[in-house]
Amino acid sequence: QHWSTWLHDAVRKCAEYEMMVDIHDEYRPTGFSRTYPNLLTQEGIHGNEQVPNADHNTMLPFTRFTIGAGDYTPGYTRKDLQTTFAHRLALPVIYYSPAQFLFWNEKLTDEHKRPELDFWKNIPTVWQDTKFLLGEIGEYAVVARRSGTTWYVGGITNTNARCLQLDCSFLSSDKKYIATIYTDDVEVPGKIKITTRKITLKTKLSFMLQRS
């Protein structure tokens, strides 16, 4: 009670000085950001710092993220992470947070070795539309979010591999799209395969998600 009051006072003070806030550790959303939108996000989550597995990650969209934005402290190249690279790349779409920070664990000069990081550079953090397309708690989740006329779709599975079919009927009927698709490269473990294809709202895409 005491420290929650202290935090709320701090958020108010930061608002006076037009400073944004990202609260870490145990604090969870209370709706306070509705009054003070400078409170962009908060941790209050068992995130990448604790190195959770994919079973845990597929529970979060149905539990923690139903009450507000969450800073999952996403990592990407840490050697101890228990998920695939495509799983990690999908999280900023599935997990809502107006402030997204990628915890870098390699030299910045190695960035050219990871061309998929362009996805991280360009992904929005706020959205005009959100659709939960597929999911089962603790099993898998597929979320689509729109910024402007561009859609982003993220899909993850738990520690079991599975095939999922994406129905693209959420797309606009009067548009044709070019989809850039990021998947785990089954021929080169630890790498991301990037492909492009034309799609419309009538397209159905099948994906084989690797375990974790």
Predicted regions mapped to residue ranges:
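C-terminal beta-strand-rich structural cap/linker in extracellular carbohydrate-active enzymes
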Residues: 196-212
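Aromatic- and carboxylate-enriched substrate-binding clefts and catalytic-loop regions
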Residues: 1-82
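Conserved, mostly hydrophobic/aromatic
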Residues: 21, 94, 153, 212
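Glycan-recognition and catalytic regions of carbohydrate-active enzymes
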Residues: 107-152, 185-191
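Solvent-exposed beta-hairpin/edge-strand motifs
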Residues: 170-184
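Charge-patterned, long linear interaction tracts outside catalytic cores
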Residues: 72-111
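Carbohydrate-binding surface patches
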Residues: 137-173
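Acidic/polar loop patches that form or flank catalytic/metal-binding clefts of enzymes
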Residues: 19-25, 98-109, 117, 127-131, ...
